Amino acid sequence: MTDPRETVPPGNSGEETIGEAFAWLNRTVEAINREAVNHLPRELIFQVWQRSWRYWHDEQGMSESYTKYRYLCIIQKAVYMHVRKGCTCLGRGHGPGGWRPGPPPPPPPGLV
């Protein structure tokens, strides 16, 4: 009889190093930003990044990685809600300035 309990997938055995976890976080934040610009105004993404950094890092004194994690949670939820409401973007995005015309705002620091 086989064991009915879930098994840990290969590579997720708890043997990761802290460096690998931080690398995963950085890759994931960059990936969600690349996808988010196809669905959300760049201005919104930039403002969420700036406000997350200001609140979690500067005011609350949290680490850089925790700040990125909180930002990731917010942007992931925003993209999810956008798609759930019936995304009609078709992956084309909204242009360099988001929904409004004009040049794009600067990207979040470290996410060029």
Curated annotation (Swiss-Prot):
One GO term of the biological process aspect: viral life cycle
Location of this chain's protein in the cell: Virion; Host nucleus
Top-rank lineage group of the source organism: Viruses
Pro residues bias locations: 101-112
Disulfide bonds: none
Region (Binds to human NUP153): 61-80
Motif stretch (Nuclear localization signal): 65-72
Chain intervals for the UniProt region annotation (Disordered): 93-112
Alphabetically ordered keywords of this record: AIDS, Host nucleus, Host-virus interaction, Inhibition of host innate immune response by virus, Viral immunoevasion, Virion
Record GO cellular component, one term: host cell nucleus
Pfam families membership: VPR
Keyword match Protease: no
TM helices/strands, residue ranges: none
Function of the protein: Plays a role in nuclear translocation of the viral pre-integration complex (PIC), thus is required for the virus to infect non-dividing cells. Targets specific host proteins for degradation by the 26S proteasome. Acts by associating with the cellular CUL4A-DDB1 E3 ligase complex through direct interaction with host VPRPB/DCAF-1. This change in the E3 ligase substrate specificity results in the degradation of host SAMHD1. In turn, SAMHD1 depletion allows viral replication in host myeloid cells by preventing SAMHD1-mediated hydrolysis of intracellular dNTPs necessary for reverse transcription.
Subunit structure of this chain's protein: Interacts with the P6 region of unprocessed GAG. Interacts with host VPRBP/DCAF1, leading to change substrate specificity of the CUL4A-DDB1 E3 ligase complex. Interacts with host NUP153.
The family this protein is said to belong to: Belongs to the lentivirus VPX protein family.
Record-given protein name: Protein Vpx
Lineage of source species: Viruses, Riboviria, Pararnavirae, Artverviricota, Revtraviricetes
Gene for this chain: vpx
